[in-house]
């Protein structure tokens, strides 16, 4: 049984794992929460989804903390009911609200528990579960100290395949360079507002082609901002096919979520990273350091991201020679067998007949 929910950063790597397990003849069902993105993506993948009533603790005030023991107890009972019906041999959690009670339920039911942390700083749920888990995996060094095996993040096969031949200088000659801006499903207001002004400050002959994912209900205002600056850009609220978007791009401007970092490395894409400043424990900034240290990305904190500074950074990066060098370094930083290692870790517990 796979547990993951809330955001694509948890659900999409978990789907990669689920597909890998299914390819080896494993029956997979899913435990999530009622309002997360899993409610769309998991049924679309033809996987049975069970939901339990649970929400996060952070940001819910004193009332939320007072009700937490009762709510958690109810959710654990619901999760035990799912486990009793499905009878999984292994339960694997990749974060999200349902993973906490689901992991406790697995432990109470005597079923091996595997967890995987996608971020450089472990979340609250996984910090607790790491002390109960049969096996603990992490994408980054030091997420759990010494208690975890570091394997990287699962990445979709179609994205990993893009980086097999990192883009060369010759591939970018004879055409404008291509800039992909990705703000996530809700968009990034800072990018939406500052990219048009920053690009307008570049000489027309230095401006790249632009595809900008602006977020739900933010695409019209962003398109207007580009038009006001006389900068040509293709603006959309969502990107349904990220593999195709990465395949098109020479440079990506984006946030620094764990999934994004893993995909950029696997797809061999240079990046200008702007970590989300309100991420829990500032984990996006720590995530970004992996690609920055590798020479595959630049990182700027949002508080310093003026349009003028952004224009300077783009002017620094938008050369085929620079981008080709960064692309090669991105691929070198990729962990390409994370899905396989996580799947084999789960399957080995079944073969060994281990209990939690």
What are these regions (language model features)?
Residues 2-5, 22-74, 216-218, 301-303:
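Conserved nucleotide-sugar phosphate-binding/catalytic loop shared by glycosyltransferases and other
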Residues 10-21:
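Short amphipathic alpha-helix
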Residues 36, 41, 45, 164-252, ...:
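Donor-nucleotide binding loops and adjacent catalytic segments primarily
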Residues 48, 107-165:
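Active-site-proximal region of nucleotide-activated glycan assembly enzymes
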Residues 78-92, 99-114, 127-131:
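Glycosyltransferases and closely related glycan-assembly transferases
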Residues 322-336:
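A short, well-ordered alpha-helix in the C-terminal region of glycosyltransferases
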